[in-house]
């Protein structure tokens, strides 16, 4: 590593020739020289190192302009941009050399990652530049190149995972995290152990904890570092500071883990939080992981990253949000070098594992703090933080919450007076006033390069239901900046309204790739595929939507109907149960009849089948029949009225295939259900006048009569056949009389011949039981 005093020497130089002279002295160690510059940028923005944040040879404002990618500029308060600019110049000269050593590829990776961290938005050109570098590093790691130790390989993979996170490529990040975990032999899993969570808990219940898959891998606890951010207590009158585990087991002790293992755990929790809807389950899964990392009390950057991740996780929980606020405030102060008792020169020791742990720059951590303060109602305090960061978007939102939009407008107009050619300020003014002219002005000032102006204009036109114009501006915005979370969703919605379903699906696909937990996008994507006629694919997409919002009745209803359409009846039944759980569904006779009739038809087809899969098909159909019977029983038990047709298929589902002494009880239940079906159908006064209804009633009556007589003959008691015959006579006579009485008013249709045939069967049955 290049000595730290070289940074001091360079920062004090006033012309570039002197800088070139110093650089030439380190030509043999040029990659270490560039690495020192990158490390200095990290120290200035992440760990509170406040020396040499500016230089004499270039102003920070000029360095910011040189590091800008169009309108995508480094944050206004980011520090030591002079060092990053100098590193950039060297990387541009060195990256195309044919003999780059392994350490060189790693330095280039870290440079681009730091540059991207300091930019306001994800930058597509950086992603393009960094892809071949990461591919080369992947090959070097796979070959187990001697230039990298096992620890180096683990760190590099986590740094590449950090790059993937910057561009919302969570699947690729997940693969890298898993590879890094294997490299550092992290062999752990979440499991339940008995314990207590609250001060008043009398009985142990299962708590989620991190355990060793192989207990023999447990190491010896290591002492904590002296320079480490403090982990604050909750000081809650109900919750314990730590879950008290009473069961003996292979629970992970964070003090036994090395830096790579702790960093991997951080990324595992971060990936879980980023790819799942924020609910109780995600909190339960991430908390044990973060608690394990925090318990280690080692490595400043890892500890700070873990404390910020815990603050982010706890911000939505009533009993923990106070700690979330104070903890993030403490870490932000240390990152800015405020109220830090450690000597400035000693803070350089904190820079190890900054990128591997995913520690954010101080200004991003400050945004987290502002968000937590805002959620607590401390909007004025959040406003002050965002003003210092010059994050005018957030400032406008705070003024909006305070009901002081006039102050926001005054502020932005004053800034425009100072910088009249700053197109972003005109966009902010357009957001405040909702005046299209300001967006148009911003587009003109930027030579049509302002993605934010097109986005805001598109959103405003969308609100006015001018979908065609809105779509044009949203697509232009996405051409300029493809990585925008809400914009892809809105573009997909506009395309849907314009009935351009192909482009709608493309937009929603990009939306869910950037935001896997965006359940509305999953739902809309499924709807677009239905319009395309691709129902099986739409069905699978709805499954993804339900992962991220398990409580949305409309999505469950869509999933139920689509499951019926694609023949996934088991899933349709499960969805119906879920709707009943939410009290959002009564008896949908059409759906119930369709499922039941299909199962009965499939059962008949399987019985005629002679293929090798017959046994398996019978087992699957039997299982679905049992699930359907349970569903119908639940609906009946809830006193919900079923239609005669549904009662009939319910009865047929319950009917045993063979009447025997073992199945007699089930057969009697089947007969009673068929009686209910006939009574419900016969109760409709108009059925004799409607040919289709008349056919259903007579068919049910005939089936009931036949099965009644069959049961009576099986019982074979003195009175059973007489009683059954009497019931058959009473039932069939009444039905045939009503049918004959209204025959003149019944309109003949396609079922006339079939009705006549079943009437003849009924008359024959009646004759057979005549006295």
Swiss-Prot record:
TPR repeat placement: 389-415, 416-449, 451-484, 485-518, 520-552, 553-586
Tissue specificity statement from the Swiss-Prot or TrEMBL entry: Expressed in the spermatheca.
The keyword Transcription is annotated on this UniProt entry: no
Keywords, in A-Z order: Cytoplasm, Differentiation, Repeat, TPR repeat
InterPro entries, alphabetized: Pentatricopeptide_rpt, TPR-like_helical_dom_sf, TPR_rpt, TTC27/Emw1
PANTHER family: TETRATRICOPEPTIDE REPEAT PROTEIN 27 (PTHR16193:SF0)
Summary of the function given for this chain in its UniProt record: Developmental protein required for cell fate determination in both the germline and seam cells of the developing epidermis. Specifically, involved in sex determination and may function in parallel or downstream of other sex determination factors, including tra-2 and fem-3, to promote oogenesis in its role in the regulation of the switch from spermatogenesis to oogenesis in the gonads. Also implicated in the mitosis to meiosis switch in distal tip cells.
Family: Belongs to the TTC27 family.
Protein name: Tetratricopeptide repeat-containing protein trd-1
Source organism: Caenorhabditis elegans
């Amino acid at each position: 590593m290049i000595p730290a005093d070289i940074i001091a020497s360079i920062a004090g130089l006033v012309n570039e020739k002197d800088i070139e002279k110093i650089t030439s002295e380190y030509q043999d160690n040029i990659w270490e020289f560039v690495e020192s510059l990158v490390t200095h940028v990290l120290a200035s923005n992440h760990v509170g190192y406040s020396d040499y944040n500016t230089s004499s040879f270039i102003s920070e404002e000029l360095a910011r302009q040189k590091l800008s990618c169009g309108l995508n500029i480094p944050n206004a308060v980011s520090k030591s941009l002079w060092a990053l600019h100098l590193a950039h110049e060297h990387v541009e000269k060195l990256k195309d050399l044919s003999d780059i050593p392994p350490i060189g590829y790693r330095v280039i990776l870290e440079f681009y990652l730091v540059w991207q961290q300091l930019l306001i938005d994800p930058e597509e050109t950086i992603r393009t530049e960094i892809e071949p570098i990461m591919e080369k590093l992947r090959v070097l790691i796979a070959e187990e190149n001697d230039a990298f130790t096992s620890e180096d390989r683990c760190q590099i993979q986590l740094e590449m995972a950090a790059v993937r996170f910057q561009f919302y490529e969570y699947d690729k990040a997940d693969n890298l995290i898993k590879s890094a975990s294997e490299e550092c032999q992290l062999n752990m899993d979440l499991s339940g152990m008995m314990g207590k969570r609250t001060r008043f808990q009398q009985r142990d219940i299962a708590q989620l904890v991190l355990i060793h898959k192989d207990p023999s891998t447990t190491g010896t606890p290591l002492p904590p570092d002296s320079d480490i951010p403090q982990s604050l207590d909750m000081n809650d009158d109900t919750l314990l500071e730590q879950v008290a585990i009473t069961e003996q087991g292979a629970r992970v002790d964070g003090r036994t883990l090395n830096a790579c293992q702790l960093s991997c755990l951080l990324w595992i929790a971060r990936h879980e939080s980023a790819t799942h809807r924020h609910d109780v389950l995600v909190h339960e899964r991430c908390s044990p992981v973060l608690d394990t990392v925090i318990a280690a009390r080692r490595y400043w950057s890892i500890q700070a990253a873990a404390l910020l991740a815990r603050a982010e996780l706890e911000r939505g929980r009533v009993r923990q949000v106070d700690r979330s606020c104070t903890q993030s405030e403490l870490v932000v102060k240390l990152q800015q070098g405020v109220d830090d008792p450690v000597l400035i020169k000693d803070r350089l020791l904190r820079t190890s594992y900054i990128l591997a742990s995913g520690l954010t720059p101080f200004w991003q951590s400050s945004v987290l703090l502002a968000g937590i303060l805002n959620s607590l109602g401390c909007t004025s305090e959040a406003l002050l933080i965002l003003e210092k960061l010059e994050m005018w978007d957030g400032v406008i939102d705070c003024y909006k919450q305070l009901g002081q939009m006039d102050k926001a407008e005054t502020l932005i107009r004053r800034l425009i007076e100072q910088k009249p050619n700053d197109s972003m300020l005109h966009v902010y003014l357009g957001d405040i006033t909702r005046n299209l002219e300001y967006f148009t002005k911003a587009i003109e000032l930027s030579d049509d390069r302002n993605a934010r102006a097109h986005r805001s204009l598109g959103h405003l036109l969308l609100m006015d239901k001018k979908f065609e114009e809105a779509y044009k501006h949203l697509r232009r915005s996405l051409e300029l900046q493809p990585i925008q979370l809400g914009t892809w969703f809105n573009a997909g919605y506009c395309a849907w309204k314009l009935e351009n379903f192909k482009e709608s699906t493309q937009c929603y696909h990009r939306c869910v790739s950037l935001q896997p937990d965006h359940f509305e996008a999953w739902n809309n994507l499924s709807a677009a595929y239905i319009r395309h006629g691709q129902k099986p694919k739409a069905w699978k997409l709805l499954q993804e939507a339900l992962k991220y919002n398990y409580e949305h009745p409309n999505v469950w209803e869509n999933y139920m109907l689509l499951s019926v359409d694609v023949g996934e009846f088991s899933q349709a039944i499960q969805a119906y149960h879920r709707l009943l759980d939410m009290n959002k569904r009564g008896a949908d006779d059409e759906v119930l009849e369709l499922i039941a009739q299909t199962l009965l038809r499939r059962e008949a087809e399987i019985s005629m089948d002679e293929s090798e899969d017959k046994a398996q098909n019978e087992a699957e159909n039997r299982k679905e029949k049992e699930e359907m019977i349970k569903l119908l029983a639940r609906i009946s038990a809830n006193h919900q009225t079923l239609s005669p047709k549904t009662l009939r298929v319910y009865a047929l589902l319950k009917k045993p295939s063979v009447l025997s002494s073992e199945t007699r009880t089930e057969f009697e239940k089947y007969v009673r259900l068929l009686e209910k079906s006939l009574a419900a159908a016969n109760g409709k006064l108009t059925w004799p006048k409607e040919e289709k209804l008349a056919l259903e009633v007579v068919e049910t009556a005939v089936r009931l009569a036949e099965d009644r007589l069959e049961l009576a003959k099986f019982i074979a008691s003195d009175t059973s056949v007489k009683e059954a015959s009497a019931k058959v006579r009473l039932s069939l006579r009444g039905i045939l009389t009503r049918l004959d009485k209204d025959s003149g008013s019944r309109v003949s249709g396609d079922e006339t011949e079939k009705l006549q045939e079943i009437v003849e069967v009924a008359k024959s049955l009646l004759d057979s039981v005549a006295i």
